[in-house]
Amino acid sequence: MVKLRLKRMGSKFNAFYRIVAADARAPRDGRFIEELGYYNPFSKDLKIEKELVFKWLDLGAKPTETTKTLFKKEKIMEQYHQKRQKN
């Protein structure tokens, strides 16, 4: 199963995260399939490639709770559900 989750990057006490599509069996900071964006909790900087997220959700990927919260902040889940209802 593919999950949309955060991959921890940066140094000790100065972490930032990449939003990635990864196999659920892979380690948190290990191998991933595709990078979808990034999130920096210190500067509150968030960038997400919406079209890539929509592609992975269509393919059946499951977002983790944390990534789902970030997607809701950017209204990505709402846009995805509206897009699916149109089709």
UniProtKB/Swiss-Prot annotation:
Annotated TM spans: none
A matching Pfam family: Ribosomal_S16
GO molecular function: structural constituent of ribosome
SUPFAM superfamilies xref list: Ribosomal protein S16 (SSF54565)
One GO location term (cellular component): cytoplasm
Domain of life according to the entry: Bacteria
Keywords per UniProt: Ribonucleoprotein, Ribosomal protein
Protein's UniProt keywords contain Ribonucleoprotein: yes
Biological process (GO), any one: translation
Family: Belongs to the bacterial ribosomal protein bS16 family.
Protein name: Small ribosomal subunit protein bS16
Lineage: Bacteria, Bacillati, Mycoplasmatota, Mycoplasmoidales, Metamycoplasmataceae
Gene: rpsP
